[in-house]
Amino acid sequence: MSIPADLKYTESHEWVRTEADGTLTVGITDHAQEALGDIVFFEVQELGKTVSAGDTVAVIESVKAASDIYAPVSGEIIEANSAVADTPDLVNSTPYESWLFKIKPAADAALDRLIDADAYSKSIGA
């Protein structure tokens, strides 16, 4: 199982990458996609909306279960990955390249609540 050291993580199994312009790119971890199994559907429900950390932003469904995807920080959902919406199983084959949505963090976004790769690894018992 892969847990890239250059990303931040949430306890709810999202990975977060900070882009040069300050936006955050969000996806689900390798651990999460393994637990879900074959992913068959993905939809961002909050595109263009301002959300709080922990709010449900998207839904991802597999042959086993449906899972909510949460905002890692407060901010505005500015983009959804249409490639993943069209071909959801990309998340199974390339979970760290197949991002789900982008968020423009609010000025008071609590980025320090995100955890590093070591802490995430420990949280899943890896």
UniProtKB/Swiss-Prot annotation:
Disulfide bonds: none
Keyword hit for Hydrolase: no
InterPro entries reported in the protein's UniProt record: 2-oxoA_DH_lipoyl-BS, Biotin_lipoyl, GCV_H, GCV_H/Fam206, GCV_H_sub, Single_hybrid_motif
Keyword entries, A-Z: Lipoyl
Positions of the Lipoyl-binding domain: 23-104
Cofactor(s) needed by this chain: (R)-lipoate
Cellular component GO terms held in the UniProt record: cytosol; glycine cleavage complex
Residue positions, PTM N6-lipoyllysine: 64
PROSITE patterns: BIOTINYL_LIPOYL (PS50968), LIPOYL (PS00189)
A Pfam family the protein falls into: GCV_H
HAMAP family, per database record: GcvH
Function of the molecule: The glycine cleavage system catalyzes the degradation of glycine. The H protein shuttles the methylamine group of glycine from the P protein to the T protein.
Self-association and partners: The glycine cleavage system is composed of four proteins: P, T, L and H.
PANTHER family with a match to the protein in the record: GLYCINE CLEAVAGE SYSTEM H PROTEIN (PTHR11715), GLYCINE CLEAVAGE SYSTEM H PROTEIN-RELATED (PTHR11715:SF3)
Alphabetized NCBIfam families for the sequence: gcvH, PRK01202.1
Protein name in the entry: Glycine cleavage system H protein
Species for this entry: Paraburkholderia xenovorans (strain LB400)
